[in-house]
């Protein structure tokens, strides 16, 4: 049986999907808009369970999840968030049944083909993070083409984590630095936190401010471990295909109402704000 993934016509992007066409939500107070995170990361969990509740195959949940991705990108773009990172396929997901993995790879290829024009139109810069060497040559070629097409865009940076793991990211950065030390390009004393950060997948972006996880679980699943050292965490029971702009805005409002201390006391933060 063919593993080709077909989209229903309603799932395809249209002119009405242009992100700039929807105004900012009135539900967000001005204070929240002033406290927006620069970098939001989302663990998109619950596709399979959503499909099961609908009496459908798991792949239908992944297909429905594509629409939620579009809504999240739209909401982030409208709010002026700098970076949005989506956990699409972890390095541990290869352990899933071969048929599901094959369908996910085909879905990834199809989505890259069909969404890239909409992303480019809305000035979204696509960045695939992770070890893509394990993907087929066909998929790797499509990834490079999509990244190249949007490379010059100045809007939202959309990082899609594919065959990604937080530990892998730290390890590959450390290995690059170790090689530089070995070849004499740098000394061991220059092996610093800053140097390591510069060799991670998202080296030119701000650290993650907010992690949103859908699906009702309370863990970060080896996702952006280094970059999320001081991130606020918001866990939602909502299954990913049901995630919409309202859920995104509510998570942003939750973030804005928290006091981020970075090791300081609450009193110190209040004093700094009063200056």
From Swiss-Prot:
Binding sites annotated in the UniProt record for substrate: 46-50, 58, 62, 90-92, 94, 96, 213, 219-221
Q: Name one GO molecular function term.
A: magnesium ion binding
* Any Gene Ontology biological process: regulation of cell shape
**Record-linked CDD domains:** Cis_IPPS (cd00475)
Indicate yes or no for the key word Magnesium.
yes
Q: What does the Swiss-Prot or TrEMBL cofactor note state? A: Binds 2 magnesium ions per subunit.
Q: Summarize the protein's role.
A: Catalyzes the sequential condensation of isopentenyl diphosphate (IPP) with (2E,6E)-farnesyl diphosphate (E,E-FPP) to yield (2Z,6Z,10Z,14Z,18Z,22Z,26Z,30Z,34E,38E)-undecaprenyl diphosphate (di-trans,octa-cis-UPP). UPP is the precursor of glycosyl carrier lipid in the biosynthesis of bacterial cell wall polysaccharide components such as peptidoglycan and lipopolysaccharide.
Cite a single Pfam family from the UniProt record. Prenyltransf
**EC class of the enzyme, as a word:** transferase
Subunit structure, interactors included: Homodimer.
Please report the name of this protein according to its UniProt entry: Ditrans,polycis-undecaprenyl-diphosphate synthase ((2E,6E)-farnesyl-diphosphate specific)
Which prosthetic group or cofactor does it need?
A: Mg(2+)
Q: What is its EC number?
A: 2.5.1.31
Recorded GO cellular component terms are: cytosol
Alphabetized UniProt keyword annotations: Cell shape, Cell wall biogenesis/degradation, Magnesium, Metal-binding, Peptidoglycan synthesis, Transferase
Q: Where does Mg(2+) bind?
A: 45, 232
Q: What superkingdom does the record give?
A: Bacteria
State the organism of origin.
Answer: Shewanella oneidensis (strain ATCC 700550 / JCM 31522 / CIP 106686 / LMG 19005 / NCIMB 14063 / MR-1)
Which reaction is catalysed here?
8 isopentenyl diphosphate + (2E,6E)-farnesyl diphosphate = di-trans,octa-cis-undecaprenyl diphosphate + 8 diphosphate
Record lineage: Bacteria, Pseudomonadati, Pseudomonadota, Gammaproteobacteria, Alteromonadales
